[in-house]
Amino acid sequence: MAITIQEINELRKKTQAGLMDCKKALTEANGDMEAAMEILRKKGQLVAAKRSDRDAAEGCVLAKVDGNYGAMIALKCETDFVAKNADFVALATKIIDAVVAAKCKSMDEVNALTIDGENIKDAITNRSGVTGEKMELDGFNFVEGEDIVAYNHMNQNFLCALVVLNKKGFEEAGKGVAMQVAAMSPIALDADSVPQDVKDSETRNAVDKAKQNQIGKAVENALKKAGINPAHVDSEDHIESNTAKGWITPEEAAKAREIKATVAKEAEANLKEQMIENIAKGMVAKFYKENCLLEQAYIDDNKISVAQYLKSIDKDLTVTDFKRFTLRAE
């Protein structure tokens, strides 16, 4: 039977599939609209299955708030071209709208939702069939609290944040802190909120670095005292190449090797434990200042911390939780 352009357009409007795909589906279904939709749905599942091992690194992340609940989702695809497609963004928007309306608290609850009469997973699979790209709902998070502010970075859909304040009526301050979260990627609210394994790891690294710095200074001073430029002998490759260039003599190269070995050993044996501990504490404190939200320098006034900024507005104002999604490598 002949398939009309009106039928093709109707199927395309319902499925967002390409014109030729719609025509082929209607022809195969002998003009039956429901059967054609089922054919396209199965085709979408086949396309999605074939692309399941591909890397979906682009996409759309969105955050939204409704009262005392806020959520964010990450819908992934393969290319920036598809990520910016209006239909793809519309699908992500429908998903976040449904998530917030249902106030989901787990990915299982999200996957159980329906949009436009179909399961979210099926909606994503069908869209994958239309675009020919792998798609997946790769992230979900939520917060609850007294007052929540969402930030979607310049409506570009690759970065978003949620911030929970302990008091209502400070949306502008919340927006500023949400931008802080998006820009500075804190790992915790404050030092007390940093996971213990992270604290232990940072402390170990700081102690090791403090020891190496002190040993390095001792070796550098000994080299300078011997009339050797430390930069010329900071590695075995440099010693060999700089000897070949004539920048240091073979005798200086041998002397440098001897100094580096003996002085480093002596310096390590004579390290002062209390001094190393104090230096390490300073390094860890710097880590907290750079990575804990309330201790970070506020992006709009780096002379004060985020905590100080909030207290300058209201003495009791603080952040109780935050979340962040980004599609960019950091």
Where are these regions (language model features)?
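N-terminal assembly/interaction segments in proteins that build large macromolecular machines
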Residues: 2-330
